[in-house]
């Protein structure tokens, strides 16, 4: 039998019966008992007929070893990220809850929880015995940043200053018109209307990106016409 399962055993041929050991039996007497051993166990039943004569018989109930499920995969992710989980120890598996899982194989899933989630994995082995384990994925929030600019409309040749806060590392793109593409404060001198992207990363290595558009207007074209001299 499988671990944590039971087997019903019946006997006939006598009037009364005594079973031992009784600690894993539903009863120590009767013609039918339920056995639920945790390990392979040998039992003995003694039958007594109406004349008081006795006979005994031994039997064994084998208990399959419990399959141990092992789950490998990331236990901490950032909000919006995915963790690939792999389980071993059985042949067929059921994962739950399944709403935040993509099952690529019976033993491999991609988990994308929006908040910390504990998954339960049930496995069935070659003996059709079931075992269970859990795996928790902790979801860290992405940083909440603020992004501002000294102006959103420039004339060609003018500069704009960007200020960011709420993270520990900053990366700005495109970098070609920036005085520095890292740091919380940078300046830019774009030659045309440009969309700048800030990627901010916190101490947990979680990142978020935000765009800001700077419109660049051309300079006026001056035409000088001298007065005619007479």
PLM regions and their residue ranges:
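Exposed beta-strand and adjacent loop surfaces of beta-rich binding modules
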Residues: 6, 16, 42, 58, ...
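Solvent-exposed loop segments of extracellular immunoglobulin-like
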Residues: 13-23, 89-97, 166-174
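Interdomain boundary/hinge segments at the C-termini of tandem beta-sandwich modules
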Residues: 59-65, 135-141, 212-218
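Solvent-exposed segments in extracellular or luminal domains encompassing
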Residues: 29-43, 105-119, 180-196
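Short, exposed coil/turn segments at beta-strand boundaries within extracellular/luminal domains
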Residues: 2, 27, 50-56, 78, ...
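Proline-enriched interdomain boundary motifs that mark the N-terminal boundary
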Residues: 66-73, 142-149, 219-226
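A short beta-strand segment in extracellular, disulfide-stabilized domains
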Residues: 3-13, 79-89, 153-166, 230
